[in-house]
Amino acid sequence: MSNLISVAEYTDTLLKHYRIVTVLSERNESKVLRLRHKNLNRDLILRSLNTKVAAYDTLCKVKSENLPEIYDAKVLSDGQIVLEEFISGITVADVMKSGKYRYRGAKHVLSAVCNALSVLHQNGIVHRDVKPENIIISDEGRVVLTDFNISRRISTNTKDTVVMGTVGYASPEQLGVTATDTRTDIYAMGVLLNVMLTGKHPSETLARGKAGKIVKKCTAINPDDRYQSAQKLAEAL
């Protein structure tokens, strides 16, 4: 019998020192809260997950300007709790409500995300959900890739058995055809670039010129035909 406490018990203990500022999201599989320390007036993000995401163990040890700091990731009796840096800012999705990006602005954002992905991939993690809603532009202009709830450790031996990701951004291999790897994130980056420039999925409207060529290579059906690393994509940008 496990001696681990539950997610609810851990949260109750934490809330003796923090108060809930807002519920950022609530789904069947997860809940995300913004908390504020009652005495220190400092904010953090609390993620309650109903399954263990192994990638968070690695993320606790990873540092990058373009990734949020993960303070702790505790496996509990009925799930996992993640304590994460709160970043004040707006998402790329929020920015796009005011209009499309120009190439220079999109390049700045994607180059930063490429840096984040390079760090993840070097540590054996594939993000699997790169999209405008998961990229924050901080009040200071820092570009940060967030939300690792469906990230996985890279394995060449197992294919994805559960369809995960966001429709339109998910690569063919995320449908269970084969194992996801670093090139899965490259596919999503191509869709992201196209959406930022045109407001449309590349299957509807392809970006013009150099950007369109980059998008086509990123979103090739065969992963071998895509950029083989985030660094190679950054160089192409």
For each feature predicted by the language model, list its residue ranges.
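Conserved HRD-motif arginine in the catalytic loop of eukaryotic-like protein kinases
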Residues: 226
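Conserved activation segment of eukaryotic-like protein kinases, specifically the C-terminal portion
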Residues: 160-173
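Conserved short submotifs of the Hanks-type protein kinase catalytic core
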Residues: 77-91
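ATP-binding glycine-rich loop module of kinase domains
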Residues: 21-57
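Catalytic-loop of the protein kinase fold
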Residues: 121-137
